[in-house]
A protein has these predicted regions:
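Conserved N-terminal entry element of GNAT/NAT acetyltransferase domains
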Residues: 1-11, 200
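Conserved GNAT-fold acetyl-CoA-binding loop/helix
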Residues: 25-44, 80-95
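Active-site rim helix/loop that mediates acceptor-substrate recognition in acyltransferases
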Residues: 34-56, 62
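Conserved beta-strand in the GNAT
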Residues: 58, 64-73
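Conserved acyl-donor/pantetheine-binding loop and adjacent beta-alpha core of acyl/acetyltransferases
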Residues: 75-130
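Conserved catalytic-core motifs of GNAT/GCN5-like acyltransferases
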Residues: 76, 163-165, 178-196
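Conserved GNAT acetyl-CoA-binding A-motif
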Residues: 125-127, 154-167
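Conserved acetyl-CoA-binding loop-helix of GNAT-fold acetyltransferases
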Residues: 130, 139-153, 175-179
């Protein structure tokens, strides 16, 4: 298989939704866990690609997307942009579920209504990112290559630091972030937060 990294194109959006779902259970396939396959992508992938496409890079294998890295240079500004331009239509489409609904779909709909958590902001690390690769794209150095491309783009924009969140069960991802030079910032509710200062 031939792999390559390229900038995001709007035609990639359905693939981003698919990859987000297929890696959405702490790195494992979450397809069977959600009735609505778009919910994860509505929160964790699509708004970044739509609102900050210049920070979205796609890994392709024989021309087909199989991974991505995306994020924002300024978490606070991104949160505000999502409130203005992204979540409104989704909140209309997905009403708040009943409290008795304990499904994963309901949890994601509640997250869409709550929006991005202000408590997850780290002032010294204003940017944040998400990276997901399908299993056949892992282990060949492409995750590192995507991360390097993203971090270089942040540095060129003068961003001083970046953070990310990862499920505590996603041991492989935690090791990858540590190898990339990320350090622990915080933890809680099954999530770990890592950060990296960027020299510009």
């Amino acid at each position: 298989m031939d792999f390559a990294i390229r900038p995001y194109q709007p035609s990639d959006l359905p693939a981003l939704y698919r990859i987000c779902l297929q890696t959405g259970d702490s790195g494992a396939d979450a397809t069977g866990l959600y009735s609505d396959p778009a919910l994860l992508g509505h929160f964790y992938a699509a708004p970044y690609a739509v609102l900050e496409p210049e920070l979205c890079f796609v890994l392709v294998s024989d021309g087909a997307p199989c991974g991505y890295i995306l994020g924002t240079r300024d978490t606070a500004a991104f949160r505000a942009a999502c409130e203005r331009e992204w979540f409104g239509a989704l909140r209309d489409r997905y009403p708040l579920p009943l409290e008795s609904d304990q499904s994963r779909d309901a949890a994601m709909v509640c997250l869409i209504h709550r929006g991005h958590d202000a408590a997850a902001a780290f002032p010294e690390h204003p940017a944040h990112l998400h990276i997901d690769l399908l299993p056949h794209a892992q282990g060949g150095g492409w995750g590192r290559a995507l991360m390097t491309r993203f971090l270089e783009t942040l540095r060129a924009a003068g961003v001083r630091g970046v953070h990310l969140g990862v499920g505590a069960r996603n041991v492989g991802a935690v090791k990858f972030y540590q190898r990339m030079g990320f350090h622990s910032l915080s933890e809680g509710s099954g999530a770990l937060w890592y950060g990296m200062k960027l020299e510009t």
